[in-house]
Amino acid sequence: MDVLAVDVGGTHVKILATGQDQPRKFVSGSKLTPKRMVAEARKLAGKWKYDVVSIGYPGVVTQGRPISEPHNLASGWVGFDFEKAFGVPVKVINDAAMQALGSYKKGRMLFLGLGTGLGSTMIVDGDVQPMELAHLPYKRGTYEDYVGLRGLERLGRRKWQRHVFDVVDRLSAALEPNDIVLGGGNAKKLKDLPPGCRAGNNANAFLGGFRLWGDGVEHLPGNLVPTPPSSAPEAEAEDLSPQSEKKKKQSRKKTKKTGKAKGEQTWQDA
């Protein structure tokens, strides 16, 4: 069975079919309707063969159907007949859940997708649980306001990364995952990964779409198969957690008073 996986994002829609080695994409944005999305996806797929379709949808999905309109796209998605539009059986799943499914290994995994917005999914012993944390209150806004694209553009990379570390720390304490994956297009903009995290691979969204129909990594082309992490020791990463930043500020204040940093000797101490 050949599967067409469609990853719908706030900036682009990406597609890949089993047996193909190069994803294709087109621009999405606030004017993208589901009718236009299907038309563009079918046109872009061209001569690709597919028997079924998987759609990663940027919103709440219940029993395979969107139940809320996406925040970054046009309306009309709720109640839209995707199977009629594509002409083949279709499965719809939350976009973060689709990438999480492709990233999953075992146990309790938390997936956070850092893209235009914030995707969030827990998988516990194979059970996929989309979380929809993006628009929950966080500081003076929502999680998405601080760690989504708006937060990155407004705060700058360093402060944005600090909030990513803070969000991971909070969610890790609350959910107790034994595996944390940071995916999405902006994950690669992190200078370092928070402790206990591994980097996701955007190609895992396609793998998740294939897995929805029982297909696995054997259908992901070699140039897209995620590379296992190196076993070589890594250099110690700079700690950008909120606790570390607080300690640095206290150290700087102490340095101003004494004229030296902790552990630093002056000529009077020698």
Where are these regions (language model features)?
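Glycine-rich beta-strand-to-loop/alpha-helix junction loops that act as flexible
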Residues: 53-59, 116, 177-186, 200-202
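Oxyanion-binding and handling regions
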Residues: 153, 159-162, 170, 186, ...
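Glycine-rich phosphate-binding loop and adjoining helix at the ATP-binding site
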Residues: 29-42, 46-54, 59-108, 145-147, ...
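Short glycine-aspartate micro-motif
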Residues: 3-7, 52-54, 109-113, 181
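Short glycine-rich, Thr/Ser-proximal phosphate-binding strand/loop in the N-terminal lobe
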Residues: 2-39, 43, 124-154
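Proline-aspartate-enriched helix->loop->beta-strand connector
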Residues: 50, 161-181, 185
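Short beta-strand scaffold segments in enzyme catalytic cores
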Residues: 13-17, 59, 101, 118-123
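Intrinsically disordered, polybasic Lys/Arg-rich low-complexity tracts
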Residues: 229, 233-234, 239-267
